[in-house]
Every structure is written in C-alpha cells, then in structure tokens.
Amino acid sequence: MAEKKYGHFDDDNREYVITDPQTPWPWINYLGNEDFFSLISNTAGGYSFYKDAKFRRITRYRYNGVPMDNGGRYFYIKDGDTVWNPGWKPCKTPLDSYECRHGMNYTRITGSKNGVEASVLFFVPLHTWAEVQKMTLKNQSLETKTLKVFSFAEWCLWNAATDMENFQRNFSTGEVEVEGSTIYHKTEYRERRNHYAFYTVNTEIQGYDTDRESFIGLYNEFSEPQAVTEGKPRNSFAHGWSPIASQYIEVTLQPGESRDLIFLLGYVENEQDKKFVAKKVINKEKAHLLIQQFNTTEKVDAAFAELNQYWDNLLNIFTIKSGNDKLDRMVNIWNQYQCMITFCMSRSASFFESGIGRGMGFRDSNQDLVGFVHQIPTRARQRIIDIASTQFPDGGCYHQYQPLTKRGNNDIGGGFNDDPCWLIFGTVAYIKETGDFSILSDQVPFDNQPGSEVSLFEHLKISMNHVINNLGPHKLSLIGRADWNDCLNLNCFSWDPNESFQTTENKGEGSKAESLMIAGLFVVTGKDYVALCKQLAKEAANSSEGTIAGLAENDYLAEANRMQQAVDQMSEAVKQHGWDGEWFLRAYDFFGNKIGSDENEEGKIFIESQGWCTMAGIGLEDGLCDKALDSAKERLECEHGMVLNNPAYTTYHVEMGEISSYPEGYKENAGIFCHNNPWVIIGETVAGRGNDAWNHYTKILPSYVEEKYQTLHKVEPYVNCQMVAGKDAARPGEGKNSWLTGTAAWMWYTVSEFILGIKPDYEGLLIDPCLPSTAKEYEVVRKFRGGEYHIVIKNPDGKEKGVSRITVDGKLISGTIVPCSPGKHEVHVEM
C-alpha cells in the first residue's frame, strides 16, 4: 500500500488534525479523566462507560465488526434527498469537506455537504458524569435550508460481556422512558440496580425512536436507517430487544445563519432510598440538575474553557524548548497526554482491548505511575494504595483488579513473580516526586480483607522478600507463571488449545525455571529500596517521634544492610550464571536449559534482560553492559525499533509457552514490543552512550514515525502503540495495540529523567542528562514541590554524558542535585 498523509500535528492548539476520514485504522481519542469516559474515533465511533468498561458500559460498540468501527454517537442530516453524517460514517456519503481534531480530552468533527456545515464538539466536562455533544449547524449557501436532524445512540445493557452473549435474557430486559426531549435508559432499574443513563437535547424535538429495528428497519444497516431515509421518526417505544435513543429535530437556517444544538449523554446513580418518586417512576432529580448545567451554549463553552485550563495546568508542569519540533511536541503534549490516558484506563478499554477481559494491572499500573505522578500526585497516591490492597501476605498479588470494585481478578489470579517488585518502583517514584513519606505509614489490607492491615512500608518489605524467598538452582529469581513477558510460560507445558497459557495450572513440579529479567528488575528496585531505607533512617532520626511507619533509624539502617546484601548476591548470580559471553541470558527453563543463549538455534538473544541488567549496571565496570548493548544493537535493531528476540521462533516449543505460538515477527515472538525498547535506551544512558540512546528513542517516537509511515504504521500516529511488526513479519513496521501500553510511561520516564536528565530525588532535582552529541542546548521548565525551575542545559562540546557545573540563581552548587525551595529559580547547567 502506497504511503499517504491522513493528517498533521497542530502544536499551537495541541491537536492532531485528521483530514481524511478513511484512515488505515480508526484513529481514536479519549474523553473524560475521572469517572465517566468515552472512546471516540475520527468518524465518531466508540462508546461510553462509567468507571468500569465491563460492568457499567453505557453505549454499545461492536469490536471486529464489519464494517469496522461499527457503532457510535451518530448524527444523520437529511437535506432534501441527501443524507449525510458530519464524520462521514455510517452513511459514507462523500463530503465536500471533512476534518477531525483530536485534542486534550476533546474531539471536534466537522463536515460539510451541499452548503451546510455541521461541526460537533465532543467532551466530558470536569467532575461530570456526562458527555457533551455540541453541534453547530451553519448554512453556507445562498438559499434557505430546512434540515432534518436525527441523533443516534444505542444502549448497552450495562454488563458489556453478557450484552454480547446472553441474548435469551437481553432481548427481554431493555426498558426506556421518554420525557420531553430526554430519553432514559432504565434497563434493570429495580431492586438490584440504582443507576440509569439518559440522552437529551436542549431543544424541543419533533419525534423520537427508542427501538432499534423500528428506527433502522428490518435487515437494514446503520448506513441506511429507514426512519432517516423516509424523513419520519417512528416514535417507537422499546420493550426489550435493542433499545436506542434517537431524537428528531427540524432545523431551518437562512443563508449565513448558524444554530447550536446541545446533546448530553449522561449517567446517574441514586441512593437506595431515593430510587423512585412513585411506583416504577424513576427519580430523575439528578438527571434534571445535570441537564440544566449544560443546556445553553454559554454553559457548554464555559465548561470547555475549564477543561482546557485544566490541561494547561497539567502540561505546564514539565515543558521543553529544544529547537526540535518533533521532540518538543511529544514531550510537551502527546507523551504526557497518553500517560494520563493510561492512568485512567490501564489496559482495559481501547479499540484493541474490549474493556471486558482486563481491568487494572498490578504491574501495569505501577509502571504507568511514573508517567503521571508529576501531574496528579494525589491520585497517584490513591492508586498506590489501591494496588497494594490486592497484595497477598506472602508478597505475591493479584495480577489484575477491577476498577469498579477494586477487588482482585480471580480469573487471572497471581503467580507472576515480577509483580511485587513493581510496587517498590511505583511507590519510590511517588515519594521522590512529592517528598511525602507519610504514605508509608498508611495502613493497607491484604487482598482487601478488613483486619489484615499493615503499613505500606511493610508491603514494600514483603515485596522484596517475595523475590528473596523464590530463588532457583542458580540463585536467580524464579519466574512463576511468567514475568513481564506474559507469554514466556516456562512451567505451563500446554498442549491443549482450549486452555489459556496464563491461567492454566502450571504442570512443572518444583521450583526451577528462572528469569534474568526479574533478576535485573530486583537489582534496580532493590537499590531503590535500599536508598529509601537510608532516607527513612534520616527522616526517623529527625522526627519528633523518632520513628517513621513505626520503625526507628536503626531499624531502617539494618533493613538497608540486609537488602543490600541480597542485591549484591543477585548481581553476582547474574554475572556468574546469567552471562552468555556477549550478552545476558533471558532465562533458564524448567529443565535447566538456557534461553536466550548463543547455544540456542532460535531465540538466541532477548531484549528484556539486556535492558534490565544494563539498567541495573550489572557488570558495568567489567564491560558487560557495553557488550550487551552492542549485541542488542547488532542483533535486535531494525528500521522500526528493536525486536524482542532474535531469531524468531518458527515452531512451537511446549517448554516455552505462548511466545512460540505467534507467527514470526509479531507480538512477543520477535515483534518490536515498544514497551521494552526504553529499557535498553535507559541502559544506554547508564553506560553513557547518548548517541545510541537517541537513535533507539527516535525510532519509536510517534512524531518521527508519523513523518514517514502513516499508512504502513496503520494506527494513530500521535501516540505510541504496544507492538510494531518486526523484521521477520509479513508487514514490518505495521503497528497494533495503540494507546493503552506501558510504552507511554516508559517513553516519558526515559526522555524526562534519563535523556534530558531531570530526575526527582529525595533532596531535590538530580540533573544528569545523557544526550546525542548533536544536542548543544535546551531549556526545561519543571515545577516541583512548590518551586518552579527554569533549567538551561548547555553542551557546547557535544558531550554525551557528564555535568561539569551547575549554578542556581547565580550561585555555584556542589554536586548535581538542585535543592528544593519555593519560588522561581534559574538553573544553568554545563556539560
């Protein structure tokens, strides 16, 4: 397929502008950032939900449907005999003009046809359980236009899983109510449910429909609803089957005249004793109040301005001026924005994740935290407590939990032995950003069981102990069900195609299969834990009570010493048993055989262990890190990034599990897993190799990819995706699984702290850049603990690593940590 452009960045407005509705894949955006969320494509496809995309799905969407992107919030405009949509779909009537602007938690879709322009602004106002759809109709012709406007939303019957399965029940449960211009979805609003949804418009309507088949017509499609083509609503009332909400509005516009219509899709929960105002009559008081908040253009415009100000504040916490537009737009806008979306969604709801099978991941959410903690530290704090509450007393944890209930997901269970380490990673990042040590004293339960509470610090301690207590024959970390690579299942031995690799019971007996990835992760987080304990010793010594989280200075020093010994022992085990001669092994399987070794015919080298062991600095002084990084560059790098393993597996290996079940070049079998490319990039900065770090970074940076490969890349060019097809694939460079990926947080963490080198630390901001030799100067504004730091970094000699001097407000400081203090500060750094 030939390359073409479908859009471009608009940095001034913080938008990506799509100019062709027929993108290679639906290019989406997210609305909402608290409780009410919507996914919206460039043609207005998608759906809305409250908190949990599985249990509180409000509108229906058809994944993997034909045609693609099937279902959404649609507006049909009938102008004479012509029926069209502002977003092109679902009618696909050729438009005279089309534009979609995806911004920060809003999308504006504009289309025109035969002298009429329709522009729809979609957003979820702050602190609001509703999606606003502000439609502006404008007559650009020289004649009077009489238009027939039909709105459309299809209700989901709350549980998105059973909505697609249990039709013998579903076709009898749907219930609606119509009051003026508002259509209420009250399915199952009886004894068990206290919530309902509604769809309204701020004008008198001339008709409506609430039954899908009545509106569309039997055997018709969304592209040709019978009520629209005939220009006559049916005023249908749904009793079971498939309830919808469609308002019919007649609009007359003189030449040059425009008119706003405000549609509102909302969600309401009532207290149990206030569910009804009369028998079977739902209490609509909260809905009425919500409708009144957004029933005029002025109110909607004010709410939209408030949303934009919110994003101004968030994105001004860290800004860069480098002279490189592609870098600046990702750092200042899109990378931070994607990090906020992954905070809200984890891996639950995208156009690749159905919102049904996955909730919030223990590992995922801890990693995501480093991408947003500087923006919303209070919410980061709560997220840490929620995550820790799903831990078990032995330090293990549920792999996932549901956002609505915050309870662990029993279907997935636990046993992923990297998970506990990530709690250290996330908590340390929070404390370094905020200086809030009090979180460690918070009492947090195990498995959300009342009465089991211990301090968060105790949770961190048992997380470390979980690794120490689960070592294999080479004194390396046991892998358990899997490590970060969920598809490396060394104890599964699955021949049954009907079972899941992740959830089937391990068949390997005993504790044998070991992970070098977890070993490297343990050394990194173990060092963080040791440093935290030493800092807590200082804090306890200076505390009026002499303790922090119930422990005194000597307790923390003893714990630091204990864990340092464990870290040193793991490092030695890696050097002794995990070094293959030119790179780090990936693992030992159940039988004690090497994985990721030059001895193997396939899968000789893996990216994960090269990343984590070099991030940990294991063997740095002995040259092991340089050798491993050189090997990764030589054997894993290709045009589109670094593949996960090489060579790809061409046959199924039962002793390795799911990784060898994928076709070559896709997903975990030698695909470019963008998530782990930053691990090698950070490893490059640890080794002081700024040029290599920059080269790896820009290969997967969306703004660089967007410039060359919009068609080939397929998915959204303004955010990272999880996977890009590797060099062994049928279509190298094709992206999949966009938006909800740990790549977002890792790219942010990598560029902000390791390339640009602005690192939050306990005592202040640690300045330690690692740059390409072409980078001679850049400026960063960083807001941090009540201070604002204007940091100018100059690199006249093109050094890759090493700070020679730092001045703060004109005064030379000792070392590379800029101390915390309120107010504005000028920081000048020379390399």
Give the positions of each predicted feature.
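Anionic coordination/interaction segments
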Residues: 1-364, 378, 383-386, 429-433, ...
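Aromatic-rich carbohydrate-recognition surfaces in CAZymes
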Residues: 78, 360, 364-365, 369-380, ...
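Hydrophobic, small-residue-rich alpha-helical packing segments that form membrane-like cores
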Residues: 105-107, 157, 456, 509-524
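Beta-rich accessory regions
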Residues: 127-130, 136-148, 193-194, 202-212, ...
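Active-site acid/base region of carbohydrate-active enzymes
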Residues: 319-333, 378, 382, 387-396, ...
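Conserved hydrophobic/aromatic pocket- or pore-lining residues that grip, position, or stack substrates
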Residues: 334, 368, 613
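Solvent-exposed loop and edge beta-strand segments that line ligand/cofactor-binding
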Residues: 350-365, 408-417, 501-519, 593-616, ...
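Non-catalytic carbohydrate-binding regions of carbohydrate-active enzymes
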Residues: 402, 539, 546-594, 626-785, ...
